[in-house]
A protein has these predicted regions:
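C-terminal motif of bacterial Sec signal peptides marking the signal peptidase cleavage site
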Residues: 12-15
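Mature extracytoplasmic domains of secretory-pathway proteins
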Residues: 33-97
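C-terminal partner/receptor-binding element of secreted or periplasmic proteins
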Residues: 98-127
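Bacterial signal peptide processing site
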Residues: 17-20
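Short, low-complexity, disordered segments immediately C-terminal to signal peptides
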Residues: 22-29
């Protein structure tokens, strides 16, 4: 009986989603004289996270600049909440460098979560 319960527990743990990899990083706010326009996705972008979960960045979704990290410019969604998922669900902002999504800033944890492969994105500026 004990062995059976142990086996069930191990199988349950093996079925759990992996944790999202993060590293603490300070978000540098944009200065008043920094002109970073909001962006709008011109096409949808499907993302496959390292955790196995997928997310879609919807066509025409608007993202406003929230600050900078060494990894790129941080954008938060306008009028909605965007999340990424692993073992837990995390609110996430996009980190974009050279027209590529390189990872996510997790505001609740004040951490950066990189993508293993950057995703090319097509955006337009909003005035």
């Amino acid at each position: 009986m004990k062995n059976r319960l142990l086996l069930i527990a191990l199988l349950t743990l093996a079925g759990c989603a992996p944790m999202i990899q993060t590293a603490p990083v300070p978000l540098t706010p944009l200065t008043n004289d920094a002109v970073v326009p909001a962006i709008r996705f011109e096409t949808s972008a499907d993302l496959r996270l390292d955790t196995g979960y997928t997310r879609t960045l919807a066509r025409s979704s608007v993202w406003k600049p929230a600050g900078r990290l060494p990894q790129g410019t941080v954008y938060r969604p306008a009028g909605t909440v965007f999340t990424i998922e692993g073992r837990q669900v995390h609110e996430a902002y996009l980190v974009i460098q050279d027209k590529r999504l390189v990872g996510f800033y997790l505001p609740g944890e004040q951490s950066y979560s990189p993508l293993s492969m950057a995703v090319p994105i097509t955006t337009g500026e909003i005035q």
